[in-house]
């Protein structure tokens, strides 16, 4: 969606705009002047902007809306992060919000009776994860690692006849099958090798099932794959594609 799509034209009405950036699950990332415009047009007066940046450092280079705000205390910007992706610690189930002091105090009052809080053990664990030396290392190493994986798989997919539609963030590739083959066809072939992909129609908000315009698309996740398994993974996928296209 464009910035105009997000902001709309209801200037005198209160509104809160929600956005994941990089987008989950597409990996499309708003950056540069586009992100700057979004922050400037939607973070002040009657408008608020909540950006989920859980995948921030999966993108190379990392992108944050915080780069475009001069004084967060004079804004309605909310930036969310999580240990799940960037800090590679999904088990502790901890996230955070950066916002103005006033908005954080309001959220803190609500969480005390509405949410319950985070366990002491998770807080201690996260405190160590956020040690500056470790976060500097994560911001350097993680984007490079996933970028290598992203580019390597994209190149291989193009060579075996898949069309890719992927952003620069996240650890997924969106691929389109040729010859009107469906993701359901591909999964049936992959199951024989103990593998699977996520069907595009399972991510269709219109919930059109087999009639979905996304039925020829699938999502391939390289996030949890051992880099050394690359050849085997491409071989399994190539055989499955050959099976459904014969």
Residue ranges of predicted features:
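Helix C-cap/helix->beta junction micro-motif
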Residues: 44-45, 160, 193
């Amino acid at each position: 969606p464009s910035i105009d799509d997000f902001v709309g034209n209801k200037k005198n009405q209160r509104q809160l705009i929600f956005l994941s950036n990089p987008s989950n699950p597409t990996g499309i990332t708003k950056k540069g002047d586009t992100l700057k415009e979004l922050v400037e047009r939607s973070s002040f007066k009657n408008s608020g902007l909540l950006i989920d940046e859980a995948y921030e450092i999966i993108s190379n280079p990392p992108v944050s809306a915080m780069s475009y705000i001069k004084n967060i205390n004079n804004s309605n910007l909310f930036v969310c992060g999580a240990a799940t992706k960037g800090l590679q610690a999904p088990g502790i189930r901890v996230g955070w919000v950066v916002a103005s002091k006033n908005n954080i105090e309001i959220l803190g009052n609500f969480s005390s009776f509405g949410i319950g809080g985070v366990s002491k053990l998770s807080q201690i664990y996260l405190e160590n994860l956020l040690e500056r030396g470790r976060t500097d290392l994560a911001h350097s190493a993680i984007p490079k690692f996933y970028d290598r994986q992203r580019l390597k798989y994209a190149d291989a997919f193009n060579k075996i006849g898949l069309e890719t539609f992927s952003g620069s963030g996240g650890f997924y590739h969106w691929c389109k099958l040729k010859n009107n083959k469906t993701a359901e066809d591909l999964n049936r072939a992959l199951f024989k090798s103990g593998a699977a992909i996520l069907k595009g129609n399972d991510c269709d908000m219109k919930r059109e099932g087999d009639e979905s315009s996304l039925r020829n698309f699938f999502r391939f996740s390289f996030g949890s794959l051992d880099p050394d398994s690359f050849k085997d993974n491409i071989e399994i996928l190539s055989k499955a594609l050959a099976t459904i296209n014969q």
